[in-house]
């Protein structure tokens, strides 16, 4: 086919400066939204509307507007104060507030109506997905190791191939223009035009198998009578974000839910997050159940194991020594053990008093005193390691 019969493709050009204003405003808006998410993240993660949601809802957060200059009349321009009549002494009042002793004007705060303008802001809708991206960016399972690589592999899609045919949405513009330039240069006219069918280049993908390691997280929660509404809400808030984090970042992580009072039992995820119980507290029961699960179902040779236990620390005193012994036994089989204690009023905790004597780098604990501590507990338990990550 001669070159005159080749289908030609053109390169269009537009004065994008006409559209720049809207684009800049949109970019600035997005930057302010991301800044607001970052600043409000500790409080947002414990919003009841999020924790009790189906994961598809949106939340509203305040976005402060840009400060703008305002022109106002200076009502005090004719009010001046002089030195006096010459009889001034040390300590004499030589000037007073021009408002005549009246209360300073300002925006309303709390009770009573204010008489000055407040700070402008509006509420932006943010999806839970955006919160997750900001929250989970620096989190990872600690001490994750390779186990049974050959039996456990995941599929991953990568755009790593270039072909002459493909979807128009995947056209590689740079390679296409370079190909056209080279072909035109060989004919004596070095330019990007015309572009022929043979110059087109398309990016395409291949499915890549990557080795991955199995892991199991044992979510253990105290549901005894001493765990009040606030304590259970805090514990469930942590486990809500923990499960979303694990399922977002890892494809081969199992989660077992264990609830306990004086006895422990494996429950469904729905029961774990909704069912309430009462009774006394014997924390050793949940550690025995965790060890039983590991022995029967999750061998340390095949799984990375992470137990997390949340309680108010109000345990039967005679049971504390048994708890320490079982926790030490668990740590021999696990990558890390995490203990979270919900203790709003900083009261004496029999369980924490015993756990503070555990000297092991794989034992981590965090005391939650306010809602924002759910965020900080997640950062503490799942902080990025400084060492080399597992590929």
From Swiss-Prot:
InterPro entries: Spore_YhbH, UPF0229. Residues 98-115 have a biased composition (Gly residues). Residues 1-31, 80-117 are annotated as: Disordered. Residues 1-16 have a biased composition (Polar residues). Residues 21-31 have a biased composition (Basic and acidic residues). Belongs to the UPF0229 family. This is UPF0229 protein BCB4264_A0587. It comes from Bacillus cereus (strain B4264). The lineage of its organism: Bacteria, Bacillati, Bacillota, Bacilli, Bacillales.
């Amino acid at each position: 086919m001669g070159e005159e019969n080749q289908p030609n493709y053109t390169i269009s050009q537009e004065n994008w400066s006409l559209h720049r204003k809207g684009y800049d405003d949109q970019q600035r808006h997005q930057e302010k939204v991301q800044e607001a998410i970052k600043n409000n993240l500790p409080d947002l993660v414990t919003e009841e509307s999020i924790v009790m949601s189906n994961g598809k809802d949106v939340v509203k957060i305040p976005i402060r507007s840009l400060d703008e200059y305002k022109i106002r009349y200076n009502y005090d321009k004719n009010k001046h104060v002089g030195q006096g009549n010459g009889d001034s002494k040390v300590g004499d009042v030589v000037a007073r507030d021009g408002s005549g002793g009246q209360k300073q004007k300002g925006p309303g705060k709390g009770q009573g109506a204010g008489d000055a303008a407040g700070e402008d802001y509006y509420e932006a809708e943010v999806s839970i997905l955006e919160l997750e991206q900001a929250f989970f960016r620096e989190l990872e399972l600690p001490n994750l190791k390779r186990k049974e690589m050959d039996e456990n592999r995941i599929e991953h899609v990568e755009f790593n191939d270039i072909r002459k045919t493909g979807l128009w949405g995947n056209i590689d513009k740079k390679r296409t223009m370079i190909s056209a330039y080279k072909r035109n240069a060989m004919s004596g006219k070095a330019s990007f035009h015309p572009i022929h069918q043979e110059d087109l280049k398309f990016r395409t993908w291949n499915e890549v198998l990557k080795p991955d390691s199995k892991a199991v997280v044992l979510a253990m929660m105290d549901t005894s009578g001493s765990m009040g509404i606030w304590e259970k809400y805090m514990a469930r808030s942590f486990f809500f974000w923990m499960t979303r984090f694990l399922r977002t970042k890892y494809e081969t992580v199992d989660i077992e839910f264990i609830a306990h009072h004086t006895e422990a039992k494996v429950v469904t995820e729905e029961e774990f997050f909704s069912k309430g119980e009462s009774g006394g507290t014997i924390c050793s029961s949940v550690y025995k159940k965790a060890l039983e699960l590991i022995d029967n179902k999750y061998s340390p040779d095949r799984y990375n194991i992470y137990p997390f236990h949340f309680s108010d620390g109000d345990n039967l005193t005679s049971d504390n020594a048994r708890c320490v012994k079982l926790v030490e036994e668990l740590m021999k089989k696990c990558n890390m053990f995490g203990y979270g204690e919900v203790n709003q009023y900083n009261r004496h905790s029999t369980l924490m008093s015993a756990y503070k004597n555990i000297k092991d780098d794989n034992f981590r604990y965090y005391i939650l005193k306010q809602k924002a501590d759910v965020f900080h507990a997640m950062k503490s338990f799942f902080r990025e390691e400084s060492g080399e990550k597992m590929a």
